Design a protein with these regions (language model features):
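Catalytic histidine-centered segment of alpha/beta-hydrolase-like enzymes
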Residues: 236-249
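Short beta-strand/loop motif that positions the catalytic acidic residue
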Residues: 198, 204-206
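Active-site nucleophile elbow and catalytic-triad environment of alpha/beta-hydrolase enzymes
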Residues: 177-194
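Catalytic histidine neighborhood in serine/cysteine hydrolases
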Residues: 222-239, 254
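Conserved HGGG/HGGXW glycine-rich cap/lid loop of the alpha/beta-hydrolase fold
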Residues: 15-70
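Flexible "cap/lid" loop of the alpha/beta hydrolase fold
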Residues: 109-154
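Active-site loop/oxyanion-hole signature of alpha/beta-hydrolase fold enzymes
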Residues: 44, 59-98, 102, 250
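Acidic catalytic loop of the alpha/beta-hydrolase fold
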Residues: 209-213, 238
């Protein structure tokens, strides 16, 4: 059984996207990272421990993140739609016929958009830490993380190592501004209109102590993605898949089978 992880870059939609791949199972699974995220910083325990006999696991770095640079990351109004198309086109380029999605935070939003827009290509989906719209409360939360010098050392360090301080700090500010754009749309809409179009079996995991995603966001997605299942982790915060990796991985494996 090979536990090796390969990394490569492949040309997709005019950029070179970096990804890591492991396992040799029939069932292809794409890991979608959060803001400023990458496979290596966001999904260590999943790349290492998800069942390699059952799954072929791919973790991608969205354009401008991780090792998918250049280009520098930017945030046009449709940046999440662009990520969704890039992600699906990456997996098609790698010759996967169908794929399940594991999306964290922004990656969860990207997964929802991909499942809605490319329903025939998506097998199953697990999302956590995502939101379908922006509120005043969210705006305050995001302003609170705008200045990376105020982040905890533990959260900041891996990203600083990956990007260098300047790119990391600048891109975080750009991300906050990028998210603000949704405040100007009716109801702060990010992807509300797409939720009813999701057809695949969907598991929503929520850490009840997540400081970044208030509970109403989760209930909204659960209500509007038909047939979705909600699993609550009472002690989970935003990074529940890292903090409670074994519990999370088992949950995911059971759901995907």
């Amino acid at each position: 059984m090979s536990s090796s992880v390969t990394s490569a870059k492949v040309a997709v939609n005019g950029v070179h996207l970096h990804y890591q791949q492991t396992g040799e199972g029939e069932h292809a699974v794409l890991l979608l990272p959060g803001m400023l995220g990458s496979g290596e910083t966001d999904f260590g325990p999943q790349i290492k421990n998800l069942n390699k006999k059952l799954f072929t696991v791919v973790a991608w770095d969205p354009r401008g993140y991780g090792h998918s640079r250049p280009p520098d990351r930017d945030f046009p109004m449709d940046f999440l739609e662009r990520d969704a198309k890039d992600a699906v086109d990456l997996m098609k380029t790698l010759n996967f016929k169908k794929v399940s999605l594991l999306g964290w935070s922004d990656g969860g939003i990207t997964a929802l958009i991909a499942a809605a827009k490319y329903p025939l290509y998506i097998n199953k989906m697990v999302i956590w830490g995502a939101n379908a719209y922006m509120t005043d409360e969210d705006e305050k939360i995001y302003q609170g993380i705008r200045d990376v010098s105020k982040w905890s050392e533990k959260t900041r360090k891996p990203l600083e190592t990956l990007y260098g301080y300047d790119y990391f700090a600048k891109t975080c500010e750009k991300w906050v501004d990028g998210m603000q754009q949704f405040k100007h749309l009716p109801d702060g809409n990010i992807c509300k209109h797409l939720l009813p179009l999701v057809q695949c079996p969907t598991l929503i995991v929520h850490g009840e102590k997540d400081p970044l995603v208030p509970r109403p966001h989760i209930d909204f997605i659960h209500k509007h993605v038909k047939g979705s299942r909600l699993h609550l982790m009472p002690e989970g915060k935003h990074n529940l898949h890292l903090r409670f990796a074994d519990e999370f991985n088992k949950l995911v494996e059971d759901f995907l089978q």
